[in-house]
Amino acid sequence: MELERNCMLYIYSSRGDAPSTAELQKKIESPNEATKAEGMQDLIIGMTQGEAYTRLLMTVIRYAMPSKDKRVKKLTQLYLEIVGKCRPDGSLKEEMILICNALRNDLMSPNEYVRGSTLRLLSKIRQFKVLEPLVEAILQNLTHRHSYVRRNAVMCVYSIVKNFGLDAIPATIDQIEQMLLSEGDLTTKRNAFLVLVHCASKRAIQFILQQRSEDGTGGLGFLLSSGDLFQLALLELLRKVCRQKQQQKAGLLRLIVSILPNTLPSVAYEGACSLLALSRAPVSLKAAAGAFASLLCGNSDNNVKLIVLDRLQECVQRASRRTMEEFVIDLLRGLQTPSLEVRRKILDLVLQIVGKNSVEQLLNVLKRELLRTAEPEQLTVPRTMEYRRLLIKAVHSCCTRFPEAAASVVNVLIDFPGDPDVTTATEVAVVVRELVATCVHLRSRIISRVVDAFPDSAHARVLRVSLWMLGEFCEDSELLDSFLTAVYAACSPLPFTSGDSGGAEGEQRSGCQPKLKMTTRTVVLEDGTYGTEDVYESVNEKGDSSAKAGKTALRKFILGGDFLLASTVAVTCAKLILKTSDEVHAQLAEEFERHREAVQEKAGRRTLTGDAQARETLLERQELEGKVAPVKLRASTEQKTRVLYLVACLLKFLRLSSSGAGAHSDAAIRVCQSLRALCGLMTGLEKEKAFVRHWVHHGRFALERVLALGPVSDDPFTWNLKDAEDEKTVSAPDDLAFFRQLRPDRQSLMVASEGVAAVGEDSLEEDEIYYSACAGLARGAELEEVDETEADLQLTVGGAGGTSPSLSGGNAKDDAALFQQRLAKVQPITGQADPLYVEAFLQVNQFDLLVEMLVVNRTQDSLQNVTVEPSTHGDLKLVERPAPVSLAPGQQAVLHAPIKVRSTEAGIILGYVTFSRRGSSDKECLVLNELHIDVLDYIERRWTCELAFRSMWAEFEWENKIHVNTSFTDVSEFLEHLMKMTNLTVVGFRPPASVMRRLKFSAACAGLDEAERAAGDGEEDEDRYLQSVRKIPTLRKLSESSSFFAVNLYSRSIFGEDALVNVSIEKLPGGKLAGSIRIRSRTQGIALSLGDRITVVQRGLTK
């Protein structure tokens, strides 16, 4: 039978026993067509289930094939498809002559359906002796009047030529080509062209070129009139020919470009993908990007949009920014979709290609979208707040890169600090602070708006940022007077008292006695479980809570225990009053002049040394131009007295507060310093003047260090954009150039890695470094250009974190070191004295884990049926069990067990191995040692900002608390080792530019659809990052001069699970470190796994 070659159906039969041959013969010979059809159906079902029924072939030929009933005819053709046509010796059965005659009659039938279905049957037959007498009839159907017959005739001809060669039908190509010129049915034309593509690609190319020369439109009219199916077949031909014949590539690519604007979406997508895979010319990439942009705006399906955005991301990586900049507005039209993920990817793409020519248009669109999110009807739309935060981050990125364009969005941004969403308001406040520091031409305008919006601020951090901005950059006496008046009014009535809680004391004085109201709320306990707590709140007689009875948000926060805000109010007011002094103004002017001279000297050294890659901050350039200079402010005696009284009231409130502030708290000390500065200004004491000089001068330079240290946005693209442009690695003229293709020990490395990882596919862009805010490209394997990459050898040594040494460049390590690194990961899982010695190597490749086991026969006997039976514990799934092997004495074998990893939950691989000795029927069994999955293999080094960290910390529910227990006595060494062993990064601190440039598209190499992938590439990058962490001033000062140390860390697993870590350490008098490490995550698995990892790491530390 033909079941092994062609079986188009398998129907389950509920009958217990298969019908006998006699029963089926009786039904088939019946004159009733329904009975005959039932018999044919039972015959086909029986044959597909293994019954032979060889004696019924002649019965079917005599009684079923001549039938005119459509159902019987169709069942007969299905029978002919599966029936055996040859004898056991391979010769054709005699009955096939009768079948050929019947098939010929069907090919000449006046019924078009019979002809078409017969042609479909013949395309599935693989015996040429059956087809040979029917070739003439098949070719005659190529010119049949009905398209259904011609369509199937073309596919039948293609099947014959494909299986038996062109010699089976010598004139096939000529007839197909003539058919293409006169065919009107689009599907038939597409089938005919496919025959030329697969059987005679040269003739297909000649046909296309001939149409281009004969058509006045360059072949475009012919192609557009041929339909989308024909165009898809043409694209398949062009991809095939362009890779084989480079001399014709340019003309064929122009043909693809010409058909993109006027085709259906399917053709446009395939054509753009073809251009992307075949060419890197700017014209081709621009045409492909234009087609993708049209598809993005013209489709409503979010899945289509995401796929198109992945392709656009690939265009961005291959093309220059100037080439892609013209598509900024086209991409922004896609923001009309309600999908937040689509919007995020669009904004990421736009931020990568925006330039000076398009930034104004981009900011106008972002401003319009921001205003639209503030409309009342938009507040009910899901995830509107998240979309607003994305827009604000995009505006921040544009303003950071193009400060001259920030004027158009300042007014809109300043309206958002009063937003009810604390994350959005804080993000806007930080953006405005940076604009004030960097955009001198907008400073007075921004400060004026900040003063007006100050009373509307409803969040403590927004108030602190606003106060700091006004204290540093308020350069107008009228604004100073307005601001000080607003602050004094917001803090009134004075003085503060420790018993005052949002107006409760005032109510008591007025005779309105407050009552206590108990509220029960749900909280998350330390162990991650839920609990409840009772909160008592004072309520007045009108039913309003005391917290809501306060006049202003500023007073409410101060009375509620926000002592940092209280100290900020005191410092800001004192600093502004100090700037009104002639002596302080002269000191500030002298300090700025000295700083400007230092900047000029530094710039001169850069010019002399020719260090064109050195970077000057925008603030330094403005100081060189003389745009940043201290301004003399004026304040009335009444304002000075008010400020002194306010600061004194704040100090008294902090010292007498029962909420834990006290006289020795940081906030109280800072307020006391403000009071000393004001007293020094008014009393004129020389000791106090020296304190004022030290206290006032360095605030603005602190902001510069903050802006240089870390990002204010969690958009990774804004972190490394300037670094990637300005801080390029320059090689010395005498540096050696390494070529991977000329390495002498390449073969030895391949031998060392044999059986572990095959050479994979990747783009030819291995020598260029790409990074995107939207990681994870959906790349078509059939369209990718194939080359060997270093990522394959990186995966060979195991680990998703990327710890393998680089194989190219001046820092390339020996292949022997790479082999030693892999050898160190081998773990024995049986003993040396056991009959079978088994050792395992865990090769991690993203979501897959391959257990490679070396099995060695240590006995002098032959061992048969050696079977390793692995099993898994945790979120692991065994994909395939190793096959049994037989081992001679001393022989060894390598077995593989692929395992699918679904999460970072701690997993264990265990099992046993069974075998039997020759001549013995008893089976022996050895229990294997456990293999623990290292969570570090699935945790990547990622970066995030403080705002995103706080938002996730408040949102995540699972928490794992670990007590610090280590022999380290130096905090910085402990932190460095902890980060190195867990792939954690410092929150809010961006990596060096050299690390960011080496971040690759790991999604393109691993085939993942994940967004924002960033992992350190190699041990050198890891060391470079850890060295940069040591230089963070705040961490260095804490570790050197403080007995308490706290830092936030972050990482993400390859499964997209965020891990938030808070390290709080206290240095005891004896030098021992104590404290806790808190881990929070959205899921329980990564919190527990990372906690176990940290516990093992810190316990195993030795100084």
Curated annotation (Swiss-Prot):
UniProt subunit comment: Oligomeric complex that consists of at least the alpha, beta, beta', gamma, delta, epsilon and zeta subunits.
CC terms in the record's Gene Ontology section: COPI vesicle coat; Golgi membrane
Primary site of residence: cytoplasm
GO molecular function: structural molecule activity
Keywords noted in UniProt: Cytoplasm, Cytoplasmic vesicle, ER-Golgi transport, Golgi apparatus, Membrane, Protein transport, Repeat, Transport
Membrane topology according to the record: Peripheral membrane protein
Organism: Toxoplasma gondii
Gene3D superfamilies named in the record: Leucine-rich Repeat Variant
Job description of the protein: The coatomer is a cytosolic protein complex that binds to dilysine motifs and reversibly associates with Golgi non-clathrin-coated vesicles, which further mediate biosynthetic protein transport from the ER, via the Golgi up to the trans Golgi network. Coatomer complex is required for budding from Golgi membranes, and is essential for the retrograde Golgi-to-ER transport of dilysine-tagged proteins.
Name assigned to this protein: Coatomer subunit beta
Cellular localization per UniProt: Cytoplasm; Golgi apparatus membrane; Cytoplasmic vesicle, COPI-coated vesicle membrane
GO BP terms, alphabetized: endoplasmic reticulum to Golgi vesicle-mediated transport; intra-Golgi vesicle-mediated transport; intracellular protein transport
Superkingdom of origin: Eukaryota
HEAT repeats: 51-89, 94-129, 130-166, 247-284, 322-359, 365-404, 405-441
